[in-house]
Each structure stands twice: as structure tokens, then as C-alpha cells.
Swiss-Prot record:
Pfam families in the record: Med26 (PF08711), TFIIS_M (PF07500), Zn_ribbon_TFIIS (PF01096)
Described function: Necessary for efficient RNA polymerase II transcription elongation past template-encoded arresting sites. The arresting sites in DNA have the property of trapping a certain fraction of elongating RNA polymerases that pass through, resulting in locked ternary complexes. Cleavage of the nascent transcript by S-II allows the resumption of elongation from the new 3'-terminus.
Annotated protein name in UniProt: Transcription elongation factor S-II
InterPro entries: TF_IIS-typ (IPR035100), TFIIS/CRSP70_N_sub (IPR003617), TFIIS/LEDGF_dom_sf (IPR035441), TFIIS_cen_dom (IPR003618), TFIIS_cen_dom_sf (IPR036575), TFIIS_N (IPR017923), TFSII (IPR006289), Znf_TFIIS (IPR001222)
UniProt source species: Saccharomyces cerevisiae (strain ATCC 204508 / S288c)
Classification lineage: Eukaryota, Fungi, Dikarya, Ascomycota, Saccharomycotina
């Protein structure tokens, strides 16, 4: 199945997204006939489109999509390992150092230069001698004839292209999909403030040096344009920051509960930090009714807090 055939199926999936029967039929065809490669996945964005049905309310569809995505990832990883093994074998083959430019494998009886083989193995990567951006990549981002949308598209392209090995058309396709979804959710003509706010959320998180995985996930389709256009800002945060946000939220909840609930002071509890016995506490039902109450304690001497059930 070539890229043209795959693109037809991608378009049909988009057109028939509300028709479960049609979606299932298309997915089954892709599952049986589509052989995934990094190049095909980038050119067609079939992974992005299929991934949209991962949370379908139709159990058969969601189950099939999860199976397909897992199978495709395995195939890509296997192909990568095979290429790496082949490269390792070539690099360590006897006589390789003597004639790297002329010795190669025979394809249809024609001897291929080793340099050609290396280029072929890197065909999925885009290498530029200049810093990656729309200007240096020769990409026209002024496609909407709308000042704000064109500016946002250019900014998205530039931030996604920076230090990327994905080809320009693939990055442009991703940037267009993100901007289009942003404008669909918050039309820039009728809700400019929300449109700009969403752009700032996406841009600041993608460009952040503390969040290197985000751009990779967007480029590979693991994070979809639909998700980017609607998610909370904290959903894009790196794992350490997410954990800190959760800890702060828990602490705020603890403080809020302690401020509104009457506390009792007792000497029954001992502070594990300062060993004082002047402890205030309150109890809440934080789980199901048949579970024991949770006791929230605060040491009146040092302020140490703990809880137990």
C-alpha cells in the first residue's frame, strides 16, 4: 500500500468518523494491508488519524485501534533495530576501511557504493546545515492570507522544526493541523483572546528546554492537534512539574479542609518530627463509607502535618 492509497483511507476515516461501521471497515483494511514505515507514517499522518479513534465509545473500534498502534510501533522499532544491525555489520566488515566509497551490496546485479547505502538508511531523516526554520527550510507559511493565523502557523512551524530531523512537509502538515484545530475551537476572528491564549500555552510548552519529550510526541502523533487545542496547560507540563502541581493541590486541599473543619487538640498523638504531644486533629471520610475515617494531624509546636487511616 503506497502513500496515495493510505491518504485515501485517511481522508475516508475523517469523512466517516461518525459512522462506526465505515470506520471499522477502513481500520480492518489498514490493519491487514498497511505496512508501516517511518516515512509513510510521517507523510500520510495515518497514525494521527487512527489514534483519534483510540477512545471511541465503540469497544470494537477502540480495541482494534490499540492493537494496530501497538503493532505499528513494534514494526517500526524492529525496522530500526534491523537497520542499526546492518550498519554495525557494514562498519565492522573486513576490508570496509580500505574502500568505503566503492564497496557495497549488489542490488539487481549492480554494485552500490557504501555511501549510497548509508544515504538510503538515512532517507527518513532530514539533515540541514542551517538552523531549522520556515525561511531556511524554504517553506511558505503565508497560506491563509490572514495576518494572525499566518503568524501563528509560522511560529508553530519554527518551534517544531528547531533541531528536528523530520522533513519540512511533515512539520508543515503538523503545524497546519494544530493551528486549524486551534481556530476551530477558538475562532480567531470571533474569539481572538482565547485563540492567542491557546497559542501561548502550546508554544511556551513546546519551546521549553525542561519539556524535551513534548515536541517528539507531537511530531510522532502521540499527542494529537485535537488534544493540544483543548487540553489544560498542566497536561502539557513535564512529569516533574506535574508531580509538583499535584503535591501543591493536595497541600492546598489539606489546608482548606483544616481551615473549615473544627479541630481538636489532644496529647494522644506524638509528632514524629519534634516528639511533642500537643497535636490538633480532625477526621474525614475520604474513601467509601465502609472504610475507616482518615485522621489529619498538625503538630501545634512545629507545624508538622501527617495523616493516617
Amino acid at each position: 500500500m503506497d502513500s496515495k492509497e493510505v491518504l485515501v483511507h485517511v481522508k475516508n476515516l475523517e469523512k466517516n468518523k461518525s459512522n462506526d461501521a465505515a470506520v471499522l471497515e477502513i481500520l480492518h483494511v489498514l490493519d491487514k494491508e498497511f505496512v508501516p514505515t517511518e516515512k509513510l507514517l510521517r507523510e500520510t499522518k495515518v497514525g494521527v488519524e487512527v489514534n483519534k479513534f483510540k477512545k471511541s465509545t465503540n469497544v470494537e473500534i477502540s480495541k482494534l485501534v490499540k492493537k494496530m498502534i501497538s503493532s505499528w510501533k513494534d514494526a517500526i522499532n524492529k525496522n530500526k533495530r534491523s537497520r542499526q544491525a546492518q550498519q554495525h555489520h557494514q562498519d565492522h566488515a573486513p576490508g570496509n576501511a580500505e574502500d568505503k566509497t566503492t564497496v557495497g551490496e549488489s542490488v539487481n546485479g549492480v554494485q552500490q557504493p557504501a555511501s549510497s547505502q548509508s544515504d538510503a538508511m538515512k532517507q527518513d531523516k532530514y539533515v540541514s546545515t542551517k538552523p531549522r526554520n520556515s525561511k531556511n527550510d524554504g517553506v511558505d507559511t503565508a497560506i491563509y492570507h490572514h495576518k494572525l493565523r499566518d503568524q501563528v502557523l509560522k511560529a508553530l512551524y519554527d518551534v517544531l522544526a528547531k533541531e528536528s530531523e523530520h522533513p519540512p512537509q511533515s512539520i508543515l502538515h503538523t503545524a497546519k493541523a494544530i493551528e486549524s484545530e486551534m481556530n476551530k475551537v477558538n475562532n480567531c476572528d470571533t474569539n481572538e483572546a482565547a485563540y492567542k491564549a491557546r497559542y501561548r500555552i502550546i508554544y511556551s510548552n513546546v519551546i521549553s528546554k525542561n519539556n524535551p519529550d513534548l515536541k517528539h510526541k507531537i511530531a510522532n502523533g502521540d499527542i494529537t492537534p485535537e488534544f493540544l487545542a483543548t487540553c489544560d496547560a498542566k497536561d502539557l507540563a513535564p512529569a516533574p512539574l506535574k508531580q509538583k502541581i499535584e503535591e501543591i493541590a493536595k497541600q492546598n486541599l489539606y489546608n482548606a479542609q483544616g481551615a473549615t473543619i473544627e479541630r481538636s487538640v489532644t496529647d494522644r498523638f506524638t509528632c514524629g518530627k519534634c516528639k511533642e504531644k500537643k497535636v490538633s486533629y480532625y477526621q474525614l471520610q475520604t474513601r467509601s463509607a465502609d472504610e475507616p475515617l482518615t485522621t489529619f494531624c498538625t503538630c501545634e509546636a512545629c507545624g508538622n502535618r501527617w495523616k493516617f487511616s
